[in-house]
Every structure is written in structure tokens, then in C-alpha cells.
Amino acid sequence: MAKLLVTGGAGFIGSNFIYYQLEHHPDDQILCLDSLTYAGNITTLRGAMERPAMGFVRGDITDRETVFAVFADYRPDIVVNFA
């Protein structure tokens, strides 16, 4: 089981990656960090958010405090950047 942090996960490519990961690696935990700008839409993750292994944080990867807090609280094993 891995803990993944997916930045930009509410966009087209990021959300498809999340669905793929949940389907093929169901034991993994995923946290999506996305600022939900023009390219991201939380509704793309509606199905994924129903799963207990999926979490979401609204935030910008350029915000140092947000990123540090996510790393401190979630402690990911892998970071996948689509932001």
C-alpha cells in the first residue's frame, strides 16, 4: 500500500490518473491537492471521492505553508505532479 499525493488531480489528466490508480491499485491511498482554477473541477472526482482511500485538499502548490502542512499531515510515499 502506497500513499500518493496527486497535485492537479482535479484536471483532465490528473483525474483520469486517479481513477486508473484506484482501479488498478485499490489498496493505495490518494490525496488530491488542487487549487480548482480554470483547469480543475471537483466534479471530475465525484466517483473517486466516494471511496475511503481518497481525500482532497483545496490548495495551491505555490503556497509553501499549504504544501508543508499536507506533507506533515499526510506523509506521502509518492508525489505525482499534474499541476
Language-model features: where?
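N-terminal Rossmann-like NAD(P)+-binding domain of SDR-like oxidoreductases, especially those catalyzing
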Residues: M1-A83
